[in-house]
Amino acid sequence: MAIGDIIVGIDIGTSKVCTVVGEVNNFGQIETMCSTSCKCNGLKKGKIINEEEISLSIAKTIKDAEEEANFKINSAYVTVPGKYVTIVQNSVVKELKDKFAGISLKDVQNAIMQAKDIEIPEGKTIVDIVPSEIVLDNGKIVTDPVGNLSSSFTLRAQIILVDKEYIRELTSIFKRVGIEIDGIVPTALAERNLMLDTNELHDNVMLLDIGAGNTEIGIFEGNTFTYTNTIPLGGDNITNDISLVLNISEEEAEKLKKQYGLALKSFIDNDNEIMLNTCRDESRNKVIKSSELIEIIEARIEEIFTIINKDITTNNVKSNINTVILTGRGITNINKSDVAGKINLNIPVKMSTGRLIST
């Protein structure tokens, strides 16, 4: 990417579609120019269930983004949930004919192409190769090897594989909208540069994006993308629990969640009374204590973190995580979510501050 390039990304979530327009700055980082969104229910538990609804939502967000950024959008990068992604680690050793000629850009490009030479599981296809580091013959790790003197170098890269069927569905959707797909990017990888600060980018972190209906897991060991998955639980499950247990409308449940959102009962300062306005159970008391509401929220949040912990433990990717970064509209408005995460995961957790967001 060159300085000044305009990059467009589109994320299809459980409750909405987002389009983000960014520009590459002088440091090679993408600064957000604008972000637009539109409600959409065409995705359920990570599966596309309504191509037409998704197409209309994408078209709406693109139109809004074009007006806001004053830029015509013809193509975009598209995110893919972690459940459809397989990451294969591969290393390629490139021998050079002349040690004193210096490593050329072509040498690096050839090594990247060699990294694609892997056994591809049935039903998967390669969508990207992400170089994580290059090691010279003296053991030195460099990010930009071009011009370095070395008799050989080792390229370490992640080969990103995605389900062919999901790509077919995405292609069909974007064909309807008239937008070319520049590339397909795992959601966690796309969020990494926006959600992690400079220090976190070099640390071993797990990025958790708890959305409305799904939680995206992304694990990074420095520059190396090691694991991703999707857990089919999110903020909407908390709202549904409140609605069912208290027998109130989902609209009121969502309002109460936002107003009294707290992840742990132990942090209650004042156990206020709450009047239920839409309670459908005549035998039920229409007034509850806030602790009753927070107990419902706490139980579901504990379950979400417990399932995440089981997933990363079962897949042997937990031991190297130093920090968990928490983000996502499904949980960021619930106070002490980071504390609940630390208790259940037994790893330091903090909320994402995000970066390079210009508003």
Specify the residue positions occupied by each region the protein language model found.
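Glycine-rich phosphate-binding loops at beta-strand->alpha-helix junctions
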Residues: 262-264, 319-343
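Glycine-rich phosphate-binding/hydrolytic loop that grips phosphoryl groups
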Residues: 350-359
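A conserved active-site cap/scaffold subdomain adjacent to cofactor or substrate pockets
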Residues: 232-253
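A short, acidic, amphipathic alpha-helical segment used as a generic capping/interface helix at domain edges
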Residues: 304-314
